[in-house]
């Protein structure tokens, strides 16, 4: 149950009954401090101002008609007109019991929407690097959360699988095959192969002519070029899948929807934009001028959709892509997990999409932008030599460092278990370090911070789960075998339950805002509440069996909530660390 939404509805009804205009926001929020209750309604002051009445007097009118029977034990007016709401112990205990008995921990499924999520999007013929990490793991965490809430999510890995560079790659691939027979290569070879192809293109005019011809042939559907192009895509995606699997990212080859998918749509898009009078010829190119965007001279900015040589641009592809996602995939929402530097480009493409009538306003197009990963020097994260960090190398180093950490913490584990634990901790550390930061900010990549057992880190959260789960081994009872009802005998129990029952609010916030750090913050706070409860409220040596069973139930609900929350982030838990 979303208690915040429940109370918000109740306060909204009371506002209207007290004379507020229909639809006035109740603005119910979780209280910042326990002395202000569990929730606080902040909408009274805004309504009172509109009505020209005293906020505290109007707040009293709202309280007079506010029906929170069976939910709140106390309500009070605070400050200039806030309403503090204290949940009743009976309500909290009952809801906690219901959450523990529910495989979804009390989280209701939402009315299903079709949601397209565009994330990861590496380039063909190049290895994934650290710049792909944020889109990949942020997008995947939000996708998992949306699916948990019952939505139909279509993963769209918009890989860079088209462009003039494929002419030189195919020409070089043909040259190598003619010299040495069938080519079998890993993507690591392909990086060098790409550089070699570029060098030949720049220095050998005959090769450059052939490469340009192959671009035309590839675009025309030439069988040989199509076969070579497919080989390049296959080699790339095999390597990318290894990275996805290591990171426990849910993308597969079936989710690839590359730029090439939209090639056939591009001429029709430009023709239609011309027919609608949106695209006009300017210096031989087809351009859409947008009043919504101004150039440095204050004039409508021109967005090129077809070059003078007949070629199309990324904007044209993005227009076709949005159109396809609405018309063919039936999207209600389209989420783009793309670098913040691409914001204006996307906004221009979407403005054209709306003007052309390709996607109605009822469909939400959302840019879930993110900042950069920085080194300790505050500059973009690079190798010591100043090069781009390969994602596979980063994951390798994470595993080495995690193995050293586990060895120092628990040297008596056998080798196989150490390896399993260190790999799980390594991937969790890389992901959680990123996901716990606000998506839109740049953040500093720090190995020591990432692998610390203190603070809001993956090792801390994984250990928090292991610690709670170990209570049941000591008690000799399974989590699903507990008896009796949850009862509240201590303020720490009440505080823990209140935090546990905010899980649905955290899940829905991540889904709505595309901000996984909300879940990380919630889980970290939950772990802290459990520690306070554990220190104040003996479990295994509780004064009577009913209290022991109740506290074991709270431990079980905590363990299950942490496990489910981390799972939504794509992070695995461990029974032993």
From Swiss-Prot:
A motif ('HIGH' region) lies at residues 122-132. GO terms for cellular component: cytoplasm. Keywords: Aminoacyl-tRNA synthetase, ATP-binding, Cytoplasm, Ligase, Nucleotide-binding, Protein biosynthesis. Pfam families: Arg_tRNA_synt_N (PF03485), DALR_1 (PF05746), tRNA-synt_1d (PF00750). GO terms for biological process: arginyl-tRNA aminoacylation. PROSITE patterns: AA_TRNA_LIGASE_I. This is Arginine--tRNA ligase. It comes from Vibrio parahaemolyticus serotype O3:K6 (strain RIMD 2210633). The gene is argS.
